[in-house]
Amino acid sequence: MMVIENPFLSTATSSQTPQEDGVYTSSLHNSNNPFLAPKTERVADPVMESMADDLFNSIQKKKEPSPASSASASPVKKSAEALAERSNSSMGTFDPPPRYSKIARARSTHVASSSRHRSPSHNDSSPSTQSSLKSRGSIRRYKSVREGSHRPGRSSKEPLDQIDRLDVTGLYGSGSFHHDGPFDACRPHRNRNSKKAPVAAFPKDSIANSIPKVGETYNDPSVPKDFSRKAIHESLRTKNILQSPYKSVGIEEEFPSSGNNDTPGLTDSTRIEGAMASKNAIARNEEMLAMEKAGLGRKNSLIRKLGLNRSASMMSRTPNTLNRPSNYRSHSSMGTRRSPLNSPSQLDPISNENESDTDDSNTGLRNRTSPTAAPPPPSRRKTGGLNTRPYPQHAESQMSLPLTAKERSKPKKMGFFRRLFHKKS
């Protein structure tokens, strides 16, 4: 094999002159050896010679070591041989160093971005390349552990609704606690129990959700709407209009609560067609209703047998009082009950009775009662019936007794208004 002579050594040996102290100088000013500068003194060192040989071999891309370099036994030669084993050396290329911004961007990238980098080729199988890749991998693993420990965990809270966002009074900021809204009953975690689910309280085709017909007590969506005058008048009627205004109305008795402990969570408005009760509760309710009906039937039968349904006033009435009409009032009771507001002068100022004579005999005859007839008991005012007493009250007292012959023959005095508007014949 052809051996190429090392130009560095040949130039160095030709320019050296032996001296007494073993020191030689180089007089070549135009030397091509970069390690031998002009006008410098150097000591002959075999280590430097071996390093020059190794450098020349690496430039010439020779894998075989030179004879001169193999003769030297230096620890520096072993490290140089390890560097010379690289197949694709980058000694001949001089790339500029990377910018600082590029290095900072590479450090701030996520761990997942490492997969997007170009994987090393199979040709770069030199020990230095593999060591650099191992060091990069260890640095990235260290970064992933360091960044993963400080990365905030994924929050498992539900997204805030508009009501929670508007609340800024929380101790730990907005959304510290949830405000229940009208749509919370439709959430899945509220309807896990199929028996007591809020959504199951309202059936899909519920009659309670339909528009009621005008003038009807029940809600039937299949019945056509009736907007006639009769239906509207029936719906506008007032109940119990003939009762006394002083009667106390019990709302709890007329509108009993439809509460049922078997359907918890449902109010009276939703129990119209709400969740059904259990079978045991329905059977128990039917038994109680049957017992109540049976008790009422026995009570009515006993009252009919004993005749206790008659009132005490009916039993105490005499035959004479039983034949009288219901609107009969005695003169004494009418006289004592009469008030100044019910006097004839204030009730009908235009009538002829305003200027009635003040004869005591006539008044005595009107108010005179027969000594044989017993005074009837004071009548009780009926709360549930219609008061059919004629109006005004004095008309009944004047027309209850017939007029005497003296009263018939006596001409009636004409009042002021009657004389004013009387036509002269």
Curated annotation (Swiss-Prot):
The keyword NADP does not apply. The modification Phosphothreonine is found at T358. Residues 409-425 have a biased composition (Basic residues). Residues 8-34, 122-135, 310-353 have a biased composition (Polar residues). It is found in: Cell membrane. Residues 1-204, 307-425 are annotated as: Disordered. One of its GO terms (cellular component) is cytoplasm. The keyword Phosphoprotein applies. Keywords: Cell membrane, Membrane, Phosphoprotein. Residues 66-77 have a biased composition (Low complexity). InterPro entries: Pal1. The modification Phosphoserine is found at S66, S119, S301, S339, S370. GO terms for biological process: clathrin-dependent endocytosis. Residues 144-167 have a biased composition (Basic and acidic residues). It is a peripheral membrane protein. Interacts with end4 and sad1. Belongs to the pal1 family. Involved in cellular morphogenesis and cell wall integrity. Important for the maintenance of a cylindrical cell shape. This is Protein pal1. It comes from Schizosaccharomyces pombe (strain 972 / ATCC 24843). The lineage of its organism: Eukaryota, Fungi, Dikarya, Ascomycota, Taphrinomycotina. The gene is pal1.
